[in-house]
């Protein structure tokens, strides 16, 4: 009987302990190798790159936050609502997206607090995920939070964050400087007038560098709703008659030049596949006319898009914009969610990758052209060593893009580095790409990459495959040299 009482007491004590919020702290050796000897090397390498400026050549931060420089509205707006990395896992466990403020615009204080409570209540969902790593880094390093999020601690943390967000030191421009961002690229529609970028560039109180990226996807995807109106608008913006194929091409060329005049260094393309089969000019003109009339078949629409992607590579050889390909995603996999909440709200799913044959027409024409830089991104790990590394290991124009989206996680990044390095080394890679909409995750994401690369290089030193001086040079080059070269920064 006494034993039963003792077990009951222990159970009650454990329940009480679990009900109390734990402390939140970051281990200085997080993500570094577990072996002490290798870890010592990694520490030295990481120390050398830890505080280097951040180069972010591809991402989705809204530049208006830096122009307006108004305080972030609330913790939910900053940490939860716009970040599908955060919302999708809660949705998978039964939390409706509308309960997280998705697609609702600015939230009331009551609604924002309720959204924040949901994140804290579901904190255990993120164990072992990169989202947990980024969020903890933000909370501790930027905002000084010392209590682990939970249902019990949610309101206290919310109040702490809200108080800090009201201070000048936590406005977007102050954080931009604090994060040591040297270049931040946004992603922009070809019809955008880039007025925000121009206003930032002309602001004498602003010393940062924010540049646009040309993203023409919607103008190449004939089946998308509103495509005829979109290409008509494209023509209006640049003074071209887009009622014919040649005018459509000329409009794209004109807008690319406009973007370049506002600082753009790259054009980003995200399609289901990376096919680049050429069409005869007469056939392209015929299909384009059918597309405007609404009579193009699905096969014709794909053929026109693949031909135009080849044309985009041709344009890059002429205007110098780095061409990045993010392919292999089924967008809007759950149509009801896509219709209700819009794109980029968590319902996109990866597809198998295929690069070798689909890119052959492009690479046979332009793969050795001195002006083309082509960065390939995939969500299919099986092509890292089978296709991407061999392509980048032959064609001077091709670079292997950093793991992206579902793969920008510690173990996936380690697998990527191991899969490609023996074929292409380090110099045929893009440098780290954060690709984020969540502004405050930028330093956490780049720090994660620097730690992982330091660990990988430390292993090579420990195995006597590199000396430490070479490893140090490589660590610095991955942070600074690679993105500067690949994106012409």
Segments predicted by a language model, with ranges:
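Cysteine-centered motifs
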Residues: 5-7
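Metal-cofactor-binding active-site regions of metalloenzymes
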Residues: 15-319, 368-382, 389-489
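C-terminal amphipathic alpha-helical interaction region
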Residues: 323-325
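Hard-cation-handling environments
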Residues: 334
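Active-site loop ensemble at the mouth of alpha/beta enzyme cores that anchors a bound cofactor
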Residues: 338-350
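Divalent-cation-assisted or electrostatically stabilized phosphate/pyrophosphate-binding catalytic cores
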Residues: 353-356
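Short, basic/hydrophobic alpha-helical segments
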Residues: 361-366
């Amino acid at each position: 009987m006494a034993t039963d009482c003792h077990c009951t007491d222990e159970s009650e004590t454990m329940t009480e302990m679990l009900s109390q919020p734990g402390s939140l702290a970051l281990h200085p050796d997080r993500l570094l190798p577990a072996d002490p000897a290798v870890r010592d090397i990694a520490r030295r390498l990481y120390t050398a790159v830890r505080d280097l400026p951040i180069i972010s050549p591809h991402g989705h931060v809204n530049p208006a936050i830096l122009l307006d420089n108004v305080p972030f509205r609330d913790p939910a707006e900053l940490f939860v609502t716009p970040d599908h990395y955060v919302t999708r896992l809660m949705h998978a466990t039964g939390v409706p997206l509308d309960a997280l403020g998705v697609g609702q615009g600015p939230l009331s204080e009551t609604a924002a607090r309720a959204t924040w409570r949901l994140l804290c209540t579901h904190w255990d969902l993120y164990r072992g995920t990169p989202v947990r790593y980024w969020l903890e880094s933000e909370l501790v390093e930027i905002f000084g939070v010392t209590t682990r999020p939970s249902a019990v601690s949610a309101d206290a943390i919310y109040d702490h964050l809200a108080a800090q967000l009201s201070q000048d030191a936590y406005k977007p421009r102050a954080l931009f400087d604090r994060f040591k961002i040297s270049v931040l690229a946004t992603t922009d529609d070809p019809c955008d007038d880039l007025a925000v970028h121009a206003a930032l560039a002309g602001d004498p109180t602003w010393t940062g560098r924010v540049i646009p990226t040309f993203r023409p996807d919607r103008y190449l995807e004939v089946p998308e709703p509103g495509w005829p109106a979109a290409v008509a608008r494209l023509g209006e913006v640049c003074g071209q008659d887009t009622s014919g194929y040649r005018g459509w091409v000329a409009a794209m060329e004109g807008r690319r030049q406009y973007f370049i005049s506002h600082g753009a260094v790259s054009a980003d393309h995200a399609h289901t596949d990376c096919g680049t089969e050429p069409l005869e000019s007469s056939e392209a003109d015929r299909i384009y006319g059918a597309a405007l009339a609404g009579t193009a078949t699905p096969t014709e629409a794909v053929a026109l898009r693949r031909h135009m992607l080849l044309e985009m590579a041709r344009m890059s050889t002429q205007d110098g914009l780095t061409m990045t390909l993010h392919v292999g995603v089924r967008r809007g996999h759950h149509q009801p969610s896509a219709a209700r909440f819009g794109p980029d709200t968590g319902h996109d799913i990866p597809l198998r990758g295929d690069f070798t044959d689909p890119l052959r027409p492009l690479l046979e024409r332009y793969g050795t052209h001195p002006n083309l830089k082509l960065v390939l991104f995939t969500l299919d790990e099986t092509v890292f060593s089978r296709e991407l590394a061999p392509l980048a290991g032959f064609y001077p124009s091709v670079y292997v893009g950093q793991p992206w989206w579902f793969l920008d996680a510690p173990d996936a990044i380690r697998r990527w580095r191991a899969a490609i390095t023996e074929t292409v080394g380090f110099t045929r890679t893009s440098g780290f790409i954060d690709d984020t909409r969540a502004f405050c995750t930028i330093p956490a994401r780049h720090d994660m990459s620097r730690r992982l690369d330091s660990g990988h290089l430390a292993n090579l030193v420990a195995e006597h495959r590199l000396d430490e001086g070479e490893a140090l040079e490589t660590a610095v080059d991955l942070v600074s040299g690679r993105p500067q070269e690949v994106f012409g920064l």
